[in-house]
Design a protein with these regions (language model features):
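Extreme N-terminal starter segment of soluble prokaryotic enzymes
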Residues: 1-7
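Short polar catalytic/cofactor-binding loops
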Residues: 9-15
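Cys-nucleophile CN-hydrolase/nitrilase-fold catalytic domain and related Cys-dependent amidase chemistry
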Residues: 19-108, 177-191, 195
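Structural motif
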Residues: 37-38, 145, 169
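CN hydrolase (nitrilase-like) catalytic-core segments centered on the catalytic cysteine
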Residues: 67-85, 154-243
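Active-site catalytic loop in hydrolytic enzyme cores
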Residues: 94-165, 178-191, 265
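C-terminal beta-strand edge segments of enzyme domains
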Residues: 137, 206-288
């Protein structure tokens, strides 16, 4: 079974109305092939809307929550119209008295499931966002998928839990502020693809949302394990750095399943094979 994936590398800029933001989204999505099974947008792609509130400090970025209903309505409409699954990046939303960085997955009928980012990057602390406590594998579209938002790709346990619970593709919307930050997430994303024998789709926010918010830096990619079934470097598709653009690639699920059985490096099953040895060391005991 072959799955076509499109990553929309979104270039944020200051916008003063939701209509301007919507035009940016539609500019990219109209370039997406009609037969793509999954479309992904990056983390906090709505952050340029913070300019609508005038000069402010970084902590006031949470005010973009005021656009939550319009944001959801837009992507619900697009998923229904296009009959495609859309991972609509992430957006800051208020739930009771707390704000969460939430990834929304819209099925082709407009229904939605969500994932609250579980590990907040240290620099995000200034935005006063809270952390989610759940990891879930979603049966949305033709395969089972998981979400690892940016910094979550740097926490190996996240992708391991998702993969052992059935996720074959992990989607990673991200927003990194520096070249080093981009490569940190990218290298970790590829490590997760190799060690769990999954496909990993990394989709970063790029552009300039305006002071005091940091610029986005990155290059979208569709990543595979490094083995004979795929390009030697494990890159199925890759975008131009820091451009407002899309990439599309096709991944073969049968090749992935066969690779787990008989690939050169069968890391998915071999990690379980020695779990008795790992248990001796109780890695989380003594952590403070």
């Amino acid at each position: 079974m072959k799955i076509k994936i499109t990553a929309c590398q979104f270039r944020v800029e200051k916008v003063s109305t939701f209509h301007e933001f919507q035009e940016q989204v539609e500019d990219l999505i109209t370039q997406v092939p009609e037969n793509s099974d999954y479309i992904i947008f990056p983390e906090l792609l709505t952050i340029g809307l913070s300019a609508a509130f005038g000069e402010q400090d970084a902590s006031s970025v949470i005010r973009i929550d005021e656009y939550t209903n319009q944001y959801k309505d837009l992507f619900r409409s697009l998923s229904r119209k296009r009959k495609q699954v859309i991972i609509a990046g992430t957006h800051l939303e208020r739930r009771e008295n707390e704000y969460y960085n939430i990834a929304y997955i819209f099925d082709e009928d407009g229904s939605v499931v969500e994932h609250k980012k579980t590990h907040i990057f240290p620099a995000e602390a200034n935005w006063h966002t809270s952390e989610g406590d759940e990891l879930e594998v979603y049966s949305v579209g033709r395969v089972k998928i998981g979400i690892a938002v940016c910094y979550e790709a740097e926490i190996p346990e996240i992708s391991r839990i998702l993969s052992v619970n059935g996720a074959d593709i992990i989607f990673c919307p991200s927003y990194t502020f520096t070249e080093a930050g981009f490569w940190r997430v990218r290298h970790c994303a590829h490590a997760r693809a190799i060690e769990n024998q999954v496909y990993f789709v990394h989709c970063p926010t790029v552009g300039e949302p305006g002071s005091p918010l940091p610029n986005g830096y990155g290059r979208a990619s569709i990543l595979s394990p490094c083995d004979s079934a795929w390009p030697a470097n494990g890159i199925v598709a890759e975008a131009v750095m820091n451009e407002h653009t899309i990439i599309t690639g096709t991944v073969d699920m049968d090749e992935l399943y066969e690779n787990r059985k008989s690939g050169a490096a069968t890391t998915f099953k071999d990690r379980n094979r020695r779990k008795g040895m790992y248990a001796k060391y109780k890695p989380y005991e003594g952590l403070k």
